[in-house]
C-alpha cells in the first residue's frame, strides 16, 4: 500500500526543500521497488543486504545502514536520472560504488563506500550535483581505479565534508576537464595523493580540506590546471610534498594554507607552471620550503619558517609586492628595522628589514617582514666546570637542549680568537642532559671559548658558546 506523505530530510543532507511524493517501505528486492516507484517517491530501505541497483527516475533512497553489494565487474549503484537522492547506505565490493552518469541535481550524502575496484563514488559527465558527508575509503587497492571520489568532465559540483582514506592512489581525482567545482571541507589522508587534478581542470575552488599524511603529495595539479583558487587548506606530513604544480599549471591562487612538515617540499612549482600567486601561507618545517622551476610567480605575505632550505628559485619570480605591501616573513632573517620607505632610506620603522633577504646570489626578497626568527634547537640550561683548568685537566659540560626533531649529534669544541683550536668532546644524553668531559690536553695556555654544536634529523644545526675557560700551565711547566 502506498501512503502519500511529506518526507522532510535532515539538513545534513543539504536538501533545502520538502520532497512531495509517496513514501515506500522496502525490505526486499530493492530494484523491483525502484522500478515500481514513481518520480518523486521516497524509499525507506530496511536493514539488510541488497543487490546492485540502477536508478532511472527521480527518487529519494534512504538506507539507514542498509548494504548494497555487487560483483567486482558491476557498479553497486548506477544513477542515470536527474534529481536522485541517496543517503545512509553501506556500499561495497563493486566495480564502482556509486556511479553518476550524465546527470544533474543529484545528492549523494552520508554513505560509506568501501572496497570497490574502481572509484568509490564516480561522477561522469555530470554537472550540478552534491556529494557530501560520505566516507569513500579503501577503494582501488587491488583494482584499477585507485580513487575514493572521481570526477571526469564534470562542472559545477559540490564535493564537501567527505572522508577519503587509504584509497589505491587518489583521495579525490579530477580528470580531465573539470571546472567550477567546489571541493571543500574534505579529509583526504592516507592515500598516495590527497587531491589529484590532471589535465585542463580550471576555476575550481579548493577550500578547507585536510590533505595530510599521504605517501606522495597532499595536493597535485598537472597539465594545464589553471585559475584554481586554493585557500585555507591543511597539507602536513606528506612524504614528498604538500602542494605540487606541474606541466603548465599556472595562474592559480594559493592563499591561507598551512603547508607544514612535508618530506621534501612544502610547495614545488615546476615545468612552465607560471604566473601563480602565493600569498599568506604558512610554509614550514620541510626539507625545502618553496622550490620553483617556473617563472612569473608572485610570492609575498607568507610565513616561511624553519625549513632546512627556505627557498630554491631556479626561475624568474617576484618575492615581494610593491612597498608598502612587502615581502615574506623568514624565520632565519636577522636584519634590523631602523629605516623606512621604498628604498629603506628614510629614518623610521616600517616592519620590514632594512636589508633584503637573500634567497640566492641573484634572488632576494626586498622587503622581508620582521618577527619570524625561530630557533629549531635551543639550549635551555648549561653548566661548565671548572672555569679555570690546567693543561690536561677535563672540563665537565652539561647542557639541556630542546629540539623539534631528534638530535643526531651534540659536541663541544674550543675556539680562540674565532679560530678553532685542537680538542673535541662528544656530549652523550644521560637523562635529560647532554654530558661530556672536554680534555684540555691539546690546548696551549690561554683563554678559550667552548662552543656547543648540535645537529638534528632534519639537518638543522646550532652553534652556541657555552662559556669561557682559562687554561693554565701544568705544575712545574711554564708557558712559552
What residue spans do the PLM features occupy?
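Extracellular beta-strand/beta-solenoid scaffold signature
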Residues: 70-78, 93-100, 115-124, 139-152, ...
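Surface-exposed, short loops/turns at beta-strand junctions within beta-sandwich domains
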Residues: 441-446
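Acidic Gly/Asp/Thr-rich repetitive segments characteristic of extracellular carbohydrate-active
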Residues: 22-51
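Acidic, glycine- and Ser/Thr-rich low-complexity intrinsically disordered tracts
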Residues: 22, 41-44, 274-280, 295-376, ...
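Extracellular beta-strand-rich solenoid/capping regions of secreted or surface-exposed proteins
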Residues: 31, 35, 50-60, 68-106, ...
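Extracellular acidic, Ser/Thr/Pro-rich low-complexity tracts
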Residues: 400-405, 416, 456
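Aromatic sugar-binding surface patches on proteins
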Residues: 430-437
